[in-house]
Design a protein with these regions (language model features):
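Alpha-helical segment of the N-proximal tetratricopeptide repeat
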Residues: 2-9, 25-42
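Residue at a conserved register position within TPR or TPR-like alpha-solenoid repeats
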Residues: 3-7, 34, 70, 114-116, ...
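TPR-adjacent "capping" and linker segments in tetratricopeptide-repeat scaffold/adaptor proteins
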Residues: 14-24, 131-135
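"A position-specific structural signal for the A-helix of alpha-solenoid helical repeats
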Residues: 2, 25, 29, 61, ...
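Residue-level detector of the short coil/turn that links helix A to helix B
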Residues: 8, 38, 74-77, 117-118, ...
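Amphipathic alpha-helical segments of tetratricopeptide repeats
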Residues: 48-52, 86-95, 125-133, 164-174
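Residue signature of alpha-solenoid helical repeat architecture, marking inter-repeat boundaries
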Residues: 21, 57, 100-103, 137, ...
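Single-residue signature of alpha-solenoid repeat helices
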Residues: 13, 43, 79-82, 123, ...
């Protein structure tokens, strides 16, 4: 999720996408921007191209974007296929002794999918154990996922504390993660 991981000034998302040197990262970042802009069809069309990519991180991003865009489009069976793809990435990473960073990305994607779908995270290692291996923007979004899960479990004080801790550690403006963190804060205060 290269756009989520990017620090940029609000209003500069497209310029940030355009600045990616790697064409595949730029394409996935464009799919993210489409998704977060309510353009699910365009997001899905790009994500679909990367569902079987040999680069597990591109494949994970594609799986998440494909799954959630298909939910928006009313295609639950396609969405389930994307979620299975995420599970497969974790299995492949573990089998091939991938780096801690790649495994952390797989665990993050698994938690993102299960928590936001309100499903149990059975079989996934604890996300908190992998936070140090995630880059700053993804780490901030991962903590949002932990906070969202705490909220779902009615642990409102914990959710607030997690959100507040992210703002203390950020070294820049990560608008996507920050927006979702603010949403959890508002949910907890209601």
């Amino acid at each position: 999720m290269p756009l989520i991981n990017s620090s940029f000034a609000p209003g500069q998302a497209q310029a940030t996408v355009d600045a990616f040197q790697d064409p595949d990262q730029r394409q996935i970042a464009q799919a993210e921007l489409y998704y977060f802009s309510g353009r699910a069809q365009e997001c899905r069309n790009i994500a679909e191209l990367y569902l079987q990519d040999k680069d597990l991180c591109l494949r994970l991003s594609a799986g998440l974007l494909y799954s959630f865009s298909n939910l928006t489009l009313g295609n639950p069976s396609a969405s389930r296929m994307g979620f299975r793809n995420i599970q497969e990435c974790l299995r492949l990473a573990e089998e091939n002794s991938a780096s801690e960073e790649v495994i952390a990305s797989c665990v993050f994607a698994g938690y993102l999918a299960t928590v936001l779908m309100h499903l149990p995270a059975d079989g996934l290692p604890p996300l908190k154990d992998f936070l140090p291996y995630l880059p700053a923007g993804i780490r901030a979004y991962a903590i949002y996922i932990l906070a969202h899960n705490a909220y779902l479990n009615e642990e409102y004080e914990r959710a607030l504390g997690l959100c507040q801790s992210v703002f203390l550690m950020l070294d820049g403006c990560y608008p996507i993660a920050m927006e979702y963190l603010y949403c959890v804060i508002i949910m907890c205060l209601n």
